[in-house]
Amino acid sequence: MATVRLPDGKELEVGSGERLEDVARRIGPRLARDAVVARLNGRLVDLDLPVDGGGELEFVTADSPEGLYVLRHSTAHAMAQAILELYPGSKLTIGPPVDDGFYYDIEVNGRISEEDLPRIEEKMREIARRDLPVRREEVSKEEARRLYRDNPYKLELIDEIPDERVSIYRQGDFFDLCRGPHVPSTGRLGAFKLQSVAGAYWRGDENNPMLTRIYGTAWPTEKQLRAYLKRLEEARARDHRRLGRELGLFTFAPEDVGPGIPLFLPKGETLRHLMEGFVREVQTRHGYQHVWTGHLVNERLYARSGHLEHYRDAMFPPMRDGEVSYRLKPMNCPSHMTLFNSRPRSYRELPVRYAEFATLYRYEKSGELSGLTRVRSLTQDDAHVFCTEEQVQEEFARALAIIREVLDAYGFTDYRVRLSLRDPEGGKYIADEEKWGRAEGALRAALDAAGIDYEPAPGEAAFYGPKADFMARDVLGREWQLSTIQVDFIQPGRLGCEYVGEDGERHTPVLLHRAVTGTTERFMAVLIEHYAGAFPVWLSPVQAVVIPVADRHLEYARRVREELSEGGLRVEVDDSPNSMQKKIRENARQKTPYLLIVGDREEEAGTVNVRRRGEGKRQTEMGLRGFLERVRGEVAARR
């Protein structure tokens, strides 16, 4: 006999060999029906596991984040089984759960297009109806290699597993190399939908074979699936790539200019200017000084900072000038440290706060490029604060105030903080235990002092230090990583940053890396989708369009534009040959905040007929001075 303790403190005696699914049935039929896995002594396990040792026990249902993860993982297995039944001879690789769904990369024996997805879905439903038990087996690596003797992808994975035994999950005739856990049977899969087909290189390496990647989503109920698909439809309507084209904001010319290099049209450049100007204004108010450090950097600087060793794959190839190799700049911090080192520093000067809107270049793989969210040419709202260890909390609070003011102005008030830490087992970090410990301690203390709740995320730190990432939700509830604050005890020492302390001795400053919106391009994509292209008045590239009723009113329309433009508004005149009604429709599609209709009456009175976005055909006659003050008020309030 053994004893298990439930979350409510109740204890249960379990017999030898009794399985977790049996314990769930003893507690109640509803729990037995809803549980997908269990947490036993802090570890997620399958329900058919015997409870021989006892301990702390909690059952996990599909409506919890962990249960949903398991449900989606199991649905990926069902999809893989369906594909093997429909396309015999196909080779499985990996099929993990991801945000809102799952995918599986497969070397398909044949070809799968999106037209084939309904047939695969139907086969998955058939597998669910079979209600096949899902069982875990542990086998030797030798046995696993025998099972996968014709699958080089799985053999590669098996060779990388450090243990002598590996786990296999079986359901009917299907089996897959997997750590698990999984749902008890295929009848517990819930509602699912296959969504798209794409190409993906094995392990993301362009030198490896191209595989077929099939994406899907899975939810506990049909109602939840329908709600998600509705949100997805809304997201497609807000897709920044489509809206950016329709609103004349940006374009791409991959053949002429290159993939991943966005080109901004006049309205897009205006939007960039407004976004960056807002951040510049706020951080100037908080004591930051703006600098400029160019586009090219001697490669030796990145060797000293550690970037060349840890970041080389994300850099463009070097350009050689005699004995010197230059790199397109992928980050600003080494250049800002060079500025700090340009003259002797005293403790009286600290903190020194540098900010820069710098164009950076990162060699993203072509398959990972996506609109403005993943580009090769990007503009980062980067800042670096050189301070003493005692000033870290105060400077963190200052950076936090900037982040909050900017995100709040855009309506991002629902965000959480992820504390990205080093994974001690990972090899991608600069090795210095003492400095890592001090950096993590300083960042935790700063978060605690600011009263911020945070979730640790091991393995997500930068190679030189921990960071606090601000994860914000947009109007559709989607989460985006926007702002970040990093604490760095390592790079300043590597690049020789020093100041003379109050004691007359030389000291190395602490470096805070800080970004408010991340990159201008990615944040613009987020804003386009957040607002569905209907930017608030202060942010709209064009705030008003003057529409003449007839050609004879064009001269007055241009005088209106001139007066409002002199007052600081961004105004255009629609002098196209279209009818007035078509002009109204076309400019409404451009999501212009104000349409100003002018005809005989308005010209005689010196007024405009104002039609505001979102208010239908309602019009209000206003004098130019009154309209100007109205818009100025909205801009001042950032509405």
UniProtKB/Swiss-Prot annotation:
Its cofactor is Zn(2+). Gene3D superfamilies: 3.10.20.30, 3.30.54.20, Anticodon-binding domain (3.40.50.800), Bira Bifunctional Protein, Domain 2 (3.30.930.10), Threonyl-trna Synthetase, Chain A, domain 2 (3.30.980.10). Zn(2+) binds at C333, H384, H513. Its EC number is 6.1.1.3. Keywords: Aminoacyl-tRNA synthetase, ATP-binding, Cytoplasm, Ligase, Metal-binding, Nucleotide-binding, Protein biosynthesis, RNA-binding, tRNA-binding, Zinc. Residues 1-61 form the TGS domain. One of its GO terms (cellular component) is cytoplasm. One of its GO terms (biological process) is threonyl-tRNA aminoacylation. InterPro entries: aa-tRNA-synt_IIb, aa-tRNA-synth_II, aa-tRNA-synth_II/BPL/LPL, Anticodon-bd, Anticodon-bd_dom_sf, Beta-grasp_dom_sf, TGS, TGS-like. One of its GO terms (molecular function) is metal ion binding. Residues 239-536 are annotated as: Catalytic. It catalyses: tRNA(Thr) + L-threonine + ATP = L-threonyl-tRNA(Thr) + AMP + diphosphate + H(+). Binds 1 zinc ion per subunit. Pfam families: HGTP_anticodon, TGS, tRNA-synt_2b, tRNA_SAD. PANTHER family: THREONINE--TRNA LIGASE, CHLOROPLASTIC_MITOCHONDRIAL 2 (PTHR11451:SF44), THREONINE-TRNA LIGASE (PTHR11451). Homodimer. HAMAP family: Thr_tRNA_synth. Catalyzes the attachment of threonine to tRNA(Thr) in a two-step reaction: L-threonine is first activated by ATP to form Thr-AMP and then transferred to the acceptor end of tRNA(Thr). Also edits incorrectly charged L-seryl-tRNA(Thr). Belongs to the class-II aminoacyl-tRNA synthetase family. This is Threonine--tRNA ligase. It comes from Rubrobacter xylanophilus (strain DSM 9941 / JCM 11954 / NBRC 16129 / PRD-1). The lineage of its organism: Bacteria, Bacillati, Actinomycetota, Rubrobacteria, Rubrobacterales. The gene is thrS.
